Amino acid sequence: MSLFLRKRCLCLGFLLFHLLSQVSASLRCPSRCPPKCPSISPTCAPGVRSVLDGCSCCPVCARQRGESCSEMRPCDQSSGLYCDRSADPNNQTGICMVPEGDNCVFDGVIYRNGEKFEPNCQYFCTCRDGQIGCLPRCQLDVLLPGPDCPAPRKVAVPGECCEKWTCGSDEQGTQGTLGGLALPAYRPEATVGVEVSDSSINCIEQTTEWSACSKSCGMGVSTRVTNRNRQCEMVKQTRLCIVRPCEQEPEEVTDKKGKKCLRTKKSLKAIHLQFENCTSLYTYKPRFCGVCSDGRCCTPHNTKTIQVEFQCLPGEIIKKPVMVIGTCTCYSNCPQNNEAFLQDLELKTSRGEI
């Protein structure tokens, strides 16, 4: 081999070694994070979240099931994925996989990990790592009768799975049934209702009322369904909501008749709204609901929705709809929080009722 060919092979070998070193280095966390991340957030596929890389330096698109992963390219942990590096002797790269979990047994039927099933018309359940989690289909604890409903109670409706709220004391529960629909804890906003949209689209606009907040204190979520879009398709909308802060001091009850909600005072100074790892760019003085002197639940009565800008990752600003309370009122039927529901559901599951 000539001297020229030997030099050329040596140069190519050095270049290949340099490229492999760069690729290997890009898979591991650097000793220091770069001084600045890309100004443009990564463009992820629909349904794929933007997360911090495994080094907590810059945002990247979360890797999905079956895709390659490393320290710099983490798997989507919110989907239960982990990076399996058993095939790499250097333990640097791997494949995003779902951990193998235990099966579930319910009412004599075996369900695989991740399998969804409906034990009856009232619940939708999922088997996850040997545990069964269920969500209710009947939202009677979220959809409450109005404050003008005397002696509300649940009644079974022939041919339907879910019970309905009824008003009055009639034994049959037919005259006082609320038209087959329960009234939500929130009153309609200006945009809520059924009205004819643009005649050229030939779409009848339908929007439900907002559900009760998922948490009795602290930041929660509220949902509704609407077809207010160009496709005239029913879609689910969510908004953030906070009925009262969890650290709120109990109010001194002065109204003995119990006809009014004792509203809490606004914050003396404006506060930042927070959810998960996000903080609002601007400060607000929100109004909260207090307590009822007769022991009933004090929940929002009139609300509106505003768009609030939050900053989550450095340089990333998102907008979220947030509930703003106008007035509050007292209810006899209190919406259950998630913890209470889970305890009740666990009890029913142990008894084999669902």
UniProtKB/Swiss-Prot annotation:
Changing N227Q: No effect on extracellular secretion. This is CCN family member 3. Immediate-early protein playing a role in various cellular processes including proliferation, adhesion, migration, differentiation and survival. Acts by binding to integrins or membrane receptors such as NOTCH1. Essential regulator of hematopoietic stem and progenitor cell function. Inhibits myogenic differentiation through the activation of Notch-signaling pathway. Inhibits vascular smooth muscle cells proliferation by increasing expression of cell-cycle regulators such as CDKN2B or CDKN1A independently of TGFB1 signaling. SUPFAM superfamilies: FnI-like domain, Growth factor receptor domain, TSP-1 type 1 repeat. Glycans are attached at N91, N277. Disulfide bonds join C29-C55, C33-C57, C37-C58, C44-C61, C69-C83, C75-C96, C261-C298, C278-C312, C289-C328, C292-C330, C297-C334. May be palmitoylated on Cys-241, which is important for extracellular secretion.
